[in-house]
């Protein structure tokens, strides 16, 4: 694989790990030319998933959109990008296991919320505020009460 920093064509693999129940491989690489280290991910492709938006539009599924949402939700929170990648892998795995090629955006949002709820309550509330389009402070309080009632706080 080519080094993204200097363009040298023969990098070496330092470490490989399976992710997502064997559906992906994370490789830590080093360039012998500039000594930069970087991470690559290898995943197999399945049939294309189409997302049905709330207004009825259809668009190609893009895992980067989920990752970008997680990056915002986890901003200044103690979680690594690798952990976020695992969350995205879990969500994609659930979508693929469903066997359907058309998925409503609401389902993706719910899956993200379920994963966030398990990992970080602050990120969960942040994501919920955007996903559920909170307009009033009472909506934040209600979500926090739900977490408290379920013993998650």
Swiss-Prot record:
Family label: Belongs to the NrdR family.
Superkingdom of origin organism: Bacteria
UniProt keyword GTP-binding present: no
Protein name as annotated: Transcriptional repressor NrdR
Cofactor(s) demanded: Zn(2+)
Function comment: Negatively regulates transcription of bacterial ribonucleotide reductase nrd genes and operons by binding to NrdR-boxes.
Domain spans labelled ATP-cone: 49-139
Keywords: ATP-binding, DNA-binding, Metal-binding, Nucleotide-binding, Repressor, Transcription, Transcription regulation, Zinc, Zinc-finger
Keyword tRNA processing attributed: no
GO MF annotation: an example: DNA binding
Span of zinc fingers (unnamed): 3-34
UniProt remark on cofactor binding: Binds 1 zinc ion.
GO biological process, any: negative regulation of DNA-templated transcription
């Amino acid at each position: 694989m080519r080094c993204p920093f200097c363009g040298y064509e023969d990098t070496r693999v330092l470490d490989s790990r399976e992710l997502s129940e064997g559906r992906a491989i994370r490789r830590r690489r080093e360039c012998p030319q500039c000594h930069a280290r970087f991470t690559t991910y290898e995943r197999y492709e399945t049939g294309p998933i189409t997302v049905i938006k709330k207004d009825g539009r259809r668009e190609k599924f893009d895992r980067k959109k989920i990752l970008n949402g997680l990056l915002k939700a986890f901003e200044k929170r103690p979680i690594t990008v690798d952990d976020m990648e695992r969350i995205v892998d879990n969500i994609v795995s659930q979508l693929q296991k469903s066997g359907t090629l058309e998925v409503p955006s609401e389902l993706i949002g719910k899956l993200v919320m379920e994963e966030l709820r398990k990992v970080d309550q602050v990120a969960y509330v942040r994501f919920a505020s955007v996903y559920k389009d909170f307009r009033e402070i009472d909506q934040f309080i209600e979500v926090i009460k739900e977490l408290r009632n379920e013993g998650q706080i």
